[in-house]
Amino acid sequence: TSDIYRETYISISFKRRKKMAILKLKPSGKDYIWGGHKLVDNYGKEMTGDRLAETWELSCHPDGPSFVDNGEDAGKTLRQYIEEHGKKVLGTNCERFEDFPILTKFIDAQDNLSIQVHPDNEYALKNEGQYGKTEMWYVVDAEEGAYLYHGFKKEISKDEFAKRIEEDTLLEVLNKVPVHKGDVFFIEAGTIHAIGKGLIIAEIQQNSNVTYRVYDYGRVGKDGKKRELHIEKAVAVTNCAPAKKDDSHYPHIADCDYFTVDKLNLDGTTFNKLEGTVSEKSFLSILVLDGEGTITSNGESVSYKKGDSIFLTAGSGEYSIEGVCDALLTTIRE
């Protein structure tokens, strides 16, 4: 009898462990000096400081992990969840990465961000001990007249780049782009860029927190000192040519080795339900930009609302999203 009981118990325990999950995630917040209050007022985020510049919605990065906010794993970091349940929850397409591949954020730019650049993997691993950073931006909301910087107007030399930084004339050669709600930008590592004030951005990026500031409007940080610039490293990694206008992502809004992003729009009337499958190849990340409804998979259902971050583990099988939903769906390609 005891053997039968033990075998039954082991079988049930294994099934429980194997049962895939829909995780609602709680973010870490950042109070950078350019942030505002829109993520609190309009997206229900929690703020501990004077402002909320970013929320790291899907993150295993030590500088700001996201936390499981539902079920028996509530309170654990996403990294802890993955360590306990095994890398199979990420999918076979993630096996080529040594670490969790992506980081997703909401960004509230009440003021201009610094002019900056991110290194590629080779440079970042050698000099910073972490991955480089290719990213994409989806403009969730934009005040009238909002803009950002994306690459150069024309190709310049590294020498001219360095000289313009020194002479404070860099903005003259940067590509200033008017921005509207729904715009998408793909920012390859090495592309100089900056988010302007009055923008809410959803960002999908490599799992990295390496930024080289080039120009910061002479601002001081919370310590009263001018924020550090990283001129030498920035000159080394910057591609001094105009950013590529790359339409090869279609039908996705972004598609690269690190992430594939699709846009979902359920209006609640003509289109009020999406049905799909989460295979064993990749997890599915759902970042809800607007709306509310229910996500169901594998016998589990969770409600969602504007601002939520949902993680469906690889191998979850069939799922449905029902209701009103404006969202970014992120997977990892082969």
Show the residue positions of the predicted features.
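Transition-metal
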Residues: 2-156, 211, 216-244, 261, ...
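Short acidic-glycine-tyrosine-enriched beta hairpin
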Residues: 174-185, 298-315
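Short beta-strand His + acidic residue motifs that chelate non-heme Fe in jelly-roll/DSBH
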Residues: 124-126, 192-197, 202-205, 274, ...
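Glycine- and acidic-residue-biased ligand/ion/polar-headgroup-sensing regions
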Residues: 109-112, 134-135, 139-157, 161, ...
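Tight coil/turn sites that cap or link beta-strands
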Residues: 120, 188-190, 198, 269-271, ...
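Loop-centered beta-sheet repeat module
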Residues: 164-210
